[in-house]
Amino acid sequence: MFWTWLDYRPGMNFDSVCQVMNDIGMDGIMLNAPTPDDYRIAIPIARKHGIEVYAWLWTMNLEHDRDKILAEHPDWFSVNRNGKSLADTTAYVDYYKFLCPALPEVREFIGEKIKSYCEVEGLSGIAIDYNRLVDVVLPTTLWPHYGIVQDREYAAWDYGYHPAMLEKFKSRYGYDPREQQDPSTDIKWRQFRCDQITEVANMIAGVVHSYGKTMAASPFPTPKMASRMVRQDWGKWNLDIVFPMVYHTFYTEDVSFISDCTVENVRDKNDKTVLYCGMTATDGPEMFECMDAALNSGAQGIAVFTVAGLRSSEVKNRFKTYTDSVRAVRAANGGIIEAVHPYVADTNPFTHKGIMALVEKRMRRIVAEASGKEELPPLALGEYKQTESYDATRCYRVADENSRTVFKVTFYFYGDVLSGWDVVAE
């Protein structure tokens, strides 16, 4: 019911990690190790502490065998709308080396890799990650790091244009999506690429289930967000458990993002899939606010990235008390956690008090920096007036009477949830 993700490397003190997990009430770990043999070493250690192990495996993006496949199969790599292949192009970071899901040889390669891990005795399941395309849109808080604004889909980050993908689409629909003025507006083309990723996920599920193991995944926050951002329509995947990465610090920075996403996930997930909620570790009270937001909105468990982020003895002790209490509630309720928030995701940014407080704090910081002062000044804001709306973007203009500053405030809605915001002075 309480899980974590963790990288495993030979020589690490894995026993002490498992002891900490057991002490604070965690019962499962999605472990990323270089080889199947590493799991054969790690699993007995985890089981000694009552910890269940899933193999946390990258699929469409290469990890441990990246250089080998680049050298041997450069034609396997994903291509963007500009015709650039990841075999010789970088998208954001050097380790983004995604394969094309339409290629039969890529699917065969992934299937054989999954089999090699499924053959590990004692491994309970497979949790796939990076089963998607390159981010056509990054989470909003990452934009400044790359010096970009992704208010719509741009060609350089729009992947899935490998010749095999284009030919497969054309044979089904009779046209090349590149012939359109703006291919990003073609819903059939977007969904087709999502479906190629879904076919890979369900191929993997078939392999995993043939070994009698649990099929899990760590996708983007919701199926609708993931479809837009990374072509990952995971509500159609044959998963036993899903651990969506609802990392609020990457998006709105407010805990309400977790509630909104979880409500959407209850609605849009595969009916046969048990919904958990993945979140970043916080060594403080916000950790428990985040877990409450997920469990009160319909999640049946929690995954924390990662247990190493829970450092203080105070938080560890409180985490143990929390996990014990949640298990007691679940046991008393027939093995499920009932949602207590019977609402839909709120797409009105102005009713999200936490988000608007962050927006205004950003405004105050802008005014303070412009005046050369450290103290954040009070605001006297006028009425927000919408100036523009396109794709997933809504723009507003608002003036502060105190500083005579006019702000442009932008909200982003990828999927059916408020997924990001920005503030600049005009």
Residue ranges and their predicted role:
Residues 11-38, 120-121, 239-241, 297, ...:
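Catalytic domains of carbohydrate-active enzymes, especially glycoside hydrolases
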Residues 1-15, 219:
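Boundary/entry segment of secreted carbohydrate-active catalytic domains
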Residues 54-118:
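Active-site-adjacent "subsite" loops/lids of carbohydrate-active enzymes
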Residues 244-255, 271-336:
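Substrate-binding cleft of secreted/luminal carbohydrate-active enzymes
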Residues 127, 173, 188-228, 273-283:
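Aromatic-lined carbohydrate-recognition surfaces of secreted/lumenal glycan-active proteins
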Residues 5, 26-33, 92-108, 186-196, ...:
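The substrate-binding groove and active-site-proximal loops of carbohydrate-active enzymes
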Residues 62-90, 131-178:
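Aromatic- and acidic-residue-enriched segments that line the glycan-binding/catalytic groove
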Residues 136, 214-252:
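Substrate-binding cleft/loops of secretory-pathway carbohydrate-active enzymes
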